[in-house]
Curated annotation (Swiss-Prot):
Superkingdom per UniProt: Eukaryota
Classification of source organism: Eukaryota, Viridiplantae, Streptophyta, Embryophyta, Tracheophyta
InterPro entries: HD, HD-ZIP_Homeobox_LZ_Class_II, Homeobox_CS, Homeodomain-like_sf, HTH_motif, Leu_zip_homeo
Keywords, in A-Z order: DNA-binding, Homeobox, Nucleus, Transcription, Transcription regulation
Disordered as annotated region, ranges: 58-81
Tissue-specificity statement: Expressed in seedlings, roots, stems, leaf sheaths and blades and panicles.
Keyword Protease: no
Gene: HOX17
Role of this protein: Probable transcription factor.
Protein's name according to its UniProt entry: Homeobox-leucine zipper protein HOX17
Family to which this protein belongs: Belongs to the HD-ZIP homeobox family. Class II subfamily.
GO cellular component assignments: nucleus
Listed SUPFAM superfamilies: Homeodomain-like (SSF46689)
GO molecular function, a single term: sequence-specific DNA binding
Keyword Nucleus: yes
């Protein structure tokens, strides 16, 4: 009986290290900062993820009281991440430095840490978390932009398909309508070309009149045009306006 109890205690002690890492990981994920929690959590749709990010950032801002809580880069005695509470001025200086240089070299890191009274490792961890948040927000913005583009293209494709169906229906109803139609054109002529066109039209009209046996003569004094037939008979008199000659 004693041997069986010892075996039972031994089996429990051997199995506990296999279960402990899973519970420890869950606890670490629960106590992790918002940006690390979002990177390790399963991906959600863009709308849900943006709502979660906004809610977590608002909650973090209320908890920080104007400052911010960041990872210290080290671990405590129980293995949990230590939090670094930054003041409002420290957060502002770090944000300004991040806008100028998203990635710092060791010299810049040491200078900034000395200026803020922090360790270089703390500054490095803050920049890593800030880059992760920026990348996540940019991914959400790109996702929303591509989603709107996809919706616009889908609507445009639907409209074009509807137009194609309408054109096919019209073509089936009246197939000869499109064959006889000529595309509309707009002609613009300069005055010189118009004079040349009028001269050509007059020549064509005169040639047609000769073919019909009609001759056109212009009376200089009377200022009229007389159309005569081939046998010499007068068909009609057409008065014309005589322009005075310029000296």
């Amino acid at each position: 009986m004693m041997e069986r109890a010892e075996d039972l205690r031994l089996s429990l002690s051997l199995s506990s290290p296999l279960i402990a890492p899973r519970t420890h990981h869950v606890a670490m994920l629960f106590h992790a900062p918002p940006e690390k929690r979002f990177l390790e959590m399963p991906l959600l749709p863009a709308a849900k993820r943006s709502e979660v990010v906004a809610a977590e950032e608002e909650r973090a801002g209320l908890r920080g009281g104007g400052g911010s809580d960041e990872e210290d880069g080290g671990c405590g005695i129980d293995g949990s991440r230590k939090k670094l509470r930054l003041s409002k001025d420290q957060s502002a200086v770090l944000e300004d430095s991040f806008r100028e240089h998203p990635t710092l070299n060791p010299r810049q890191k040491a200078t900034l840490a000395q200026q803020l009274g922090l360790r270089p490792r703390q500054v490095e961890v803050w920049f890593q978390n800030r880059r992760a948040r920026t990348k996540l927000k940019q991914t959400e913005v790109d996702c929303e932009f591509l989603k709107r583009c996809c919706e616009t293209l889908t609507e445009e494709n639907r409209r074009l398909q509807k137009e194609v169906q309408e054109l096919r229906a019209l073509k089936l109803v009246s197939p000869h309508l499109y064959m006889n139609m000529s595309p509309p054109t707009t002609l613009t002529m300069c005055p010189s070309c118009e004079r040349v066109s009028n001269t050509n039209n007059n020549s064509s009209a005169a040639a047609a009149a000769d073919r019909r046996g009609i001759r056109t003569t212009t009376a200089a004094a009377g200022g009229s045009v007389v159309d005569t037939a081939a046998d010499g008979g007068i068909l009609c008199h057409r008065p014309i306006a005589v322009r005075p000659q310029q000296s």
